[in-house]
């Protein structure tokens, strides 16, 4: 094809792209549509957002456009919600209309389909409701909120403390041990298994989980979701979500092994067996969400989300204890007064430990590990804070803007446990405390996370005093964003009390 022939083709393509772009811009001209930066033809606002630090970009845009502003990612309309009032109005008051998830085209490479969408990214509909009900009821049957699961967590905390003690007061990074301990709690619920901390299968799952987290952020992911036709470029699809694919493959081996020990005649011992029992009941029903593909996705969701968020929060907790030794000493004094140094902590102790409870909540608020939550999508036209948001709009909820809003917190950018204490020293929880999001899609693992955070944290502070290693600089209190916010790498010394 000669150069003369290419020119008309290029002009035609350019006109087509501009027409499509204009068609997607029409809603920006509607009355009361949220303001936002002017999108570029074809790209929209992809270049206006730093996807390596999305929360910071959103906070800058908030200062310019207000609590409710709009973006256009290629041709995908997006509205970002900031502040308690806007987030609560959208997720709670209009919860039924904002409970959907936007399509994520690249997840098709992980086995997503109409009846296999897992839990967290599933579209709001019968399949999601079925799996949400199943997961909540099964976790409750397996001991969530009961003494049996509490004892399992406390037993794992004993193993964790022993692993800390092995370092004999020498400097080490606690993250890996925290990952392993929390993973064992999830493994016990999903496949009735406890891993030794040096088990190759566990180490492989943890490595792939952390690598998979990095694949949840970045410009390439957003571009491919906004322009999925690019996935047809030869070789590109194979390079996307490599770690998440490998994680599912490793998990498949674990589930296949566990499946061989399942006895359908016996009551389910874990979530996997309960899922297999439901598969037997719904066999022959093509509309059921109980199928092999969804088993892997549901277990993967529970394992990765349940492990990572709690483990990272505990890592933040220990970091903040070595940065604030006065707070650490006060927590330990309360532990000594209520529990002592011999008896294991129990959930019943929490009622009598307002300061420790306040510290754990302040760790969650300050760490702000899921700053943007998970995206939502409107299922009908709605109004939020006086702005009209059309059906099919992707919603980002800037939870960071709620957890660190100067209108709701006395010292939003400082670690200050008194945020959760009244004048009499009693624990209080402000309504702006939303680390688990809110509404119909709020984190279903919140009760488990609360139990793990209290029991692991108090067990560690009961047994050890933590400090910055001698000769090392003071660790940074600033986190690193990669969908979740993790502490900057640090070491500590754990000295037996």
Curated annotation (Swiss-Prot):
<feature type="binding site" description="axial binding residue">
    <location>
        <position position="443"/>
    </location>
    <ligand>
        <name>heme</name>
    </ligand>
</feature>
<keyword id="KW-0479">Metal-binding</keyword>
<keyword id="KW-0256">Endoplasmic reticulum</keyword>
<protein>
    <recommendedName>
        <fullName>Cytochrome P450 2D19</fullName>
        <ecNumber>1.14.14.1</ecNumber>
    </recommendedName>
</protein>
<keyword id="KW-0560">Oxidoreductase</keyword>
<dbReference type="InterPro" id="IPR017972">
    <property type="entry name" value="Cyt_P450_CS"/>
</dbReference>
<comment type="similarity">
    <text>Belongs to the cytochrome P450 family.</text>
</comment>
<dbReference type="GO" id="GO:0005506">
    <property type="term" value="F:iron ion binding"/>
</dbReference>
<dbReference type="InterPro" id="IPR008069">
    <property type="entry name" value="Cyt_P450_E_grp-I_CYP2D-like"/>
</dbReference>
<dbReference type="GO" id="GO:0019369">
    <property type="term" value="P:arachidonate metabolic process"/>
</dbReference>
<keyword id="KW-0503">Monooxygenase</keyword>
<dbReference type="GO" id="GO:0016712">
    <property type="term" value="F:oxidoreductase activity, acting on paired donors, with incorporation or reduction of molecular oxygen, reduced flavin or flavoprotein as one donor, and incorporation of one atom of oxygen"/>
</dbReference>
<comment type="function">
    <text>Responsible for the metabolism of many drugs and environmental chemicals that it oxidizes.</text>
</comment>
<dbReference type="InterPro" id="IPR036396">
    <property type="entry name" value="Cyt_P450_sf"/>
</dbReference>
<dbReference type="Pfam" id="PF00067">
    <property type="entry name" value="p450"/>
</dbReference>
<keyword id="KW-0472">Membrane</keyword>
<keyword id="KW-0349">Heme</keyword>
<dbReference type="GO" id="GO:0020037">
    <property type="term" value="F:heme binding"/>
</dbReference>
<dbReference type="InterPro" id="IPR002401">
    <property type="entry name" value="Cyt_P450_E_grp-I"/>
</dbReference>
<dbReference type="InterPro" id="IPR001128">
    <property type="entry name" value="Cyt_P450"/>
</dbReference>
<keyword id="KW-0492">Microsome</keyword>
<dbReference type="InterPro" id="IPR050182">
    <property type="entry name" value="Cytochrome_P450_fam2"/>
</dbReference>
<dbReference type="GO" id="GO:0005789">
    <property type="term" value="C:endoplasmic reticulum membrane"/>
</dbReference>
<dbReference type="GO" id="GO:0006805">
    <property type="term" value="P:xenobiotic metabolic process"/>
</dbReference>
<keyword id="KW-0408">Iron</keyword>
């Amino acid at each position: 094809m000669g150069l003369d022939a290419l020119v008309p083709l290029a002009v035609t393509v350019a006109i087509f792209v501009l027409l499509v772009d204009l068609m997607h811009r029409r809603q920006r001209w509607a009355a009361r549509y949220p303001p936002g930066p002017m999108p570029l033809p074809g790209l929209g606002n992809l270049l206006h957002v730093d996807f390596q630090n999305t929360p910071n970009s959103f906070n800058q845009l908030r200062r310019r456009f207000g609590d409710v502003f709009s973006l256009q990612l290629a041709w995908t309309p997006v509205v970002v919600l900031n502040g308690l009032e806007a987030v609560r109005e959208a997720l709670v008051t209009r919860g039924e209309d904002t409970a959907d998830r936007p399509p994520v085209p690249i997840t098709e490479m992980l086995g997503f389909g109409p009846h296999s969408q897992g839990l967290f990214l599933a579209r709001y509909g019968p399949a999601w409701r079925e799996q949400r009900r199943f997961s909540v009821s099964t976790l409750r049957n397996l001991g969530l909120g009961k003494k049996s699961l509490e004892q399992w967590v406390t037993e794992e905390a004993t193993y964790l403390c022993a692993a800390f003690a092995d370092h004999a007061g020498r400097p080490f990074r606690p993250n890996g041990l925290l990952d392993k301990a929390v993973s064992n709690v999830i493994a016990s619920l999903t496949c009735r298994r406890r891993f030794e901390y040096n088990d190759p299968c566990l180490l492989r799952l943890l490595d792939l989980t952390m690598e998979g987290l990095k694949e949840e952020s970045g410009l390439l992911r957003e571009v491919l979701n906004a322009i999925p036709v690019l996935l047809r470029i030869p070789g590109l699809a194979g390079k996307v979500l490599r770690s998440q694919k490998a994680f599912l493959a490793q998990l498949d081996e674990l589930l296949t092994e566990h499946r061989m020990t399942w006895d359908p005649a016996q009551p389910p011992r874990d979530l996997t067996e309960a899922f297999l029992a439901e598969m037997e009941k719904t066999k022959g029903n093509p509309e059921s969400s109980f199928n092999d593909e969804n088993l892997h996705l549901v277990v993967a969701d529970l394992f990765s989300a349940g492990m990572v968020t709690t483990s990272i929060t505990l890592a933040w907790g220990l970091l903040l204890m070595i940065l604030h030794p006065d707070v650490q000493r006060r927590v330990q004094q309360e532990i000594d007064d209520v529990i002592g140094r011999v008896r294991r902590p129990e959930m019943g102790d929490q009622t009598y430990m307002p300061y420790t409870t306040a510290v754990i909540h302040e760790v969650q608020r300050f760490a702000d590990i899921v700053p943007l939550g998970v995206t939502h999508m409107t299922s009908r036209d709605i109004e939020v804070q006086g702005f009209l948001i059309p059906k099919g709009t992707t919603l980002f909820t800037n939870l960071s803007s709620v957890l660190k809003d100067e209108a709701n917190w006395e010292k939003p950018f400082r670690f200050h446990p008194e945020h959760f204490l009244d004048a009499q020293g009693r624990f209080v929880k402000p309504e702006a405390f939303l680390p688990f999001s809110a509404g119909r899609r709020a984190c279903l693992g919140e009760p488990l996370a609360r139990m793990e955070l209290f029991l692991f944290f108090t067990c560690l502070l009961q047994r050890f005093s933590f400090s910055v290693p001698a000769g090392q600089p003071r660790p940074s209190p600033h986190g690193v964003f990669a969908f979740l916010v993790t502490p900057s790498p640090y070491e500590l010394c754990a000295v037996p009390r």
